[in-house]
């Protein structure tokens, strides 16, 4: 795993260390999840990590900065610039999020967390 985007832009001129290999050298179990939007793969990685009780685990999850926002996806500007109204609308549309509300929590998410609040 080598991070490729920072707040300043691409990291390839200043950072080339493979962090996952470093942790392997320390004796960690390392598990790689190629798609940070694949919740099933993340769940499997967690179960795999929990199954190995002999050593610590590092789960590397690859994500794309600004995912879903056409003007920011894969760009360093996703770190520190406001999206703006048009980009928020495009993001909501891409992620199939309600367009009418400025802030919304899906009922199933609210219900899940409500069970722990009591």
Predicted features by range, described:
Residues 1-116:
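Glycine-rich ThDP/TPP pyrophosphate-binding loop and its adjacent helix/strand module
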